[in-house]
UniProtKB/Swiss-Prot annotation:
This is Putative antimicrobial peptide clone 4. It is found in: Secreted. Antimicrobial peptide. Has a high antibacterial activity against the Gram-positive bacterium S.aureus (MIC=5-17.30 uM), the methicillin-resistant S.aureus (MRSA) (MIC=17.30 uM), and E.faecalis (MIC=69.23 uM). Has antifungal activity against Candida spp. and one Cryptococcus neoformans strains with MICs values ranging from 6.25 to 100 uM. Also shows an inhibitory activity on C.albicans biofilms at high concentrations. Has a moderate hemolytic potency (18% at 20 uM). Also inhibits the growth of the five cancer cell lines tested. GO terms for biological process: defense response to bacterium; defense response to fungus; killing of cells of another organism.
Length: 73
C-alpha cells in the first residue's frame, strides 16, 4: 500500500480505538445509573423542590428591594 492510503487508515483506526476505549470506560457508570434508577434511589422529592423555589423567590424579592433602595449615581 502507498503511504497516502496508510496515513488516513491509521488515523481512522486511532479515532475508533479512542472512542471504543471511552465507551468501555463509561459502561460501569451506566450500569450503576440504571440499577439505581430501577431501584428508585433517585426519586425526586417534590416538597424540597417547592421549598427551593420559594427560597429563590424570596431572595429575588430581597435583591429587588436592595437595588431599589440604592442611590442612582
Amino acid at each position: 500500500m502507498q503511504m497516502k492510503y496508510l496515513i488516513p487508515i491509521f488515523f481512522l483506526v486511532l479515532i475508533v480505538a479512542d472512542h471504543c476505549h471511552a465507551f468501555l470506560g463509561m459502561i460501569p457508570g451506566l450500569i450503576g445509573g440504571l440499577i439505581s434508577a430501577f431501584k428508585g434511589r433517585r426519586k425526586r422529592d417534590i416538597t424540597s423542590q417547592i421549598e427551593q423555589y420559594r427560597n429563590l423567590q424570596k431572595r429575588e424579592a430581597e435583591l429587588e428591594d436592595i437595588l431599589a433602595n440604592l442611590p442612582v449615581y
